[in-house]
């Protein structure tokens, strides 16, 4: 069929025969056999150049055998495109490349021709600086032997590797790896095309995966303003576990007492809230959202938070919750009181209002009707926090109005109030927003602020009148002359929602929703004291001194004026009036000391919870604190009150004795005493209005105490004058300055009254 040719490579002086290569005639043509050498380098792509490839035009097999007949081939890996990648870091000395063409001539004879790979020309003689090769071509099909000219070809024989690649058509097969030289370390590198390398650490530091968007104005609020709220300290032995309220007895509590959203990792962020500078809406961080929430028309500052223990689901059993079968009723957590809410029956809603859901991790929308009433998901406990800026608007929160300059979040309410609400799908909360004035901002609690709810049951239903009060503090709402009161008319079957509009005054929400209140849970008639989240009120010594002056001097000034007026009207002498005034002062001094001691020993009134646990001294109320101040300053209070009592008590008799002393005109003396005493009473009335809480009107206080002084002085003078005339008419007085008592005593001893004047008749 064909002829066979044997190849002999140069060795160390000996010739080794190789297996003949079987070549079929007219079917196989060896096109190229290229052997290239490469230098050892890392990272250099020599995968293609590090192999010896034999390509055939048809399916055939060819083999090359090395020393000793052992075949050693490198491990090739295909990259999927028919190309092979070889090991790169094989350290092979630089050798010259020879290209061998084995071609069958037309005359049927085989020949082998060697080419220099670098020069690209046929090598017929000696190779420069390397070795000389002798080439013998056997045209008759016999063996061809190559003899080296020198011994330098031994290194080429040791470090060269022969690679066999068998191609079956166009499909390549995996080859075995070439054994490396002893002591060499091979590093494998696979070069992939179109691969970009990046600094992962810098990318992770710079990237921002999520942003927090305001649902109202669609602005990023992640890097806006972060407000930190102060924790409210609550004694656990008094209020129990504030983080796990009982479902049967839910309690209002402040947002500061809510548990952390994600456990211990987010406990540090529990006291932070996010405020958008565009629309001034405050949000509680609860997670991130992959998409920004579109702006919606909703209530600013209305935060509805579901109870972490009861998840809000749309498949909740509302039928069992209405009839009391479901024991896990939703609890409104706010302050220290709660309202157990069932569900009302509103029509389907279309618009969406974003709701902060701390148990989920993102801002969840809720449905809202076109009238503004926000619909909460069923079985969700709601907590509404309202606050405002320093404008003249008022805020109604749990029946309490907070007016000018007052800002607060959810108040601490310690009276538990239960309201049953008929609701088909969800409980409703009024959420209209009509102005841009009412903004959320936290305040610091005070120590003496409380609200007074007066509940009356009239023909029109249950009516609650709420009054804000803070003991021992100046006027809480600057610019107001009367205490802030509001009346929430619960009616017989419904409660109208109350909201903050930012304008002065209180507006009630629409008639939707209607809240039915069961008769068993209505409050009885009476008054309930509910402490509000307190504003910090600093009561210094000046305020307490002013209170002590008012306490000791106001009533004594009125009393002393009445005594002097009565004595002057009865026609007593100046000396007798002075002595009478001083005697009255000494008797009153003993009484005021007794009153101060009794006031100090009086037990204070403390606000208690349902568990009969006191809330501590900061919620102490009593007459002493309201009239004088702190009990630890009793010595100061008593001293100032006694001095004020003496000064105001001695003023009328001294003025009466020393005024108009030359003329001895009784009417002028009475007028001077009345003017001096009235001036003193007016000053004390102004001070009384200043130290009163809530601060009253100065004009009303002046008119009130001034009218009392005028009436006391006038009535005393008239009564004294009338008694004098009555005694003279009945002969119990001879017109002298002898007291009436002495004349009556003489008559009892057997002497006739007016005996010395019998001769005149």
Curated annotation (Swiss-Prot):
Q: What cellular-component terms does GO give this entry?
A: endoplasmic reticulum membrane; plasma membrane
Q: Provide the topology term for how it sits in the membrane.
A: Multi-pass membrane protein
The induction field says: Not induced by NAI1.
Annotated transmembrane regions? 549-569, 573-593, 640-660, 670-690, 702-722
Judging by the UniProt lineage, the source's domain of life is Eukaryota
Compositionally skewed regions (Polar residues) per UniProt: 136-154, 416-432
Q: Where is this region: Disordered?
A: 1-85, 120-162, 338-374, 416-448
Q: Does the keyword field hold Phosphoprotein?
A: no
Per the record, where are the segments of Basic and acidic residues compositional bias? 74-85
Record InterPro entries: ER_body_metal_sequester
Q: Where is the composition biased (Low complexity)?
A: 48-65
Q: Keywords of this protein's UniProt record, alphabetized?
A: Coiled coil, Endoplasmic reticulum, Membrane, Transmembrane, Transmembrane helix
Task: Point to the regions of Acidic residues compositional bias.
Answer: 22-31
Coiled coil regions in record: 186-206
Q: Which locations, inside or outside the cell, does it occupy?
A: Endoplasmic reticulum membrane
Broad class of the protein's primary localization: endoplasmic reticulum
Q: Which family does it belong to?
A: Belongs to the CCC1 family.
Primary role: Not essential for the accumulation of ER body components, including PYK10.
- UniProt-recorded name of the protein: Membrane protein of ER body-like protein
Q: What is the lineage of its organism?
A: Eukaryota, Viridiplantae, Streptophyta, Embryophyta, Tracheophyta
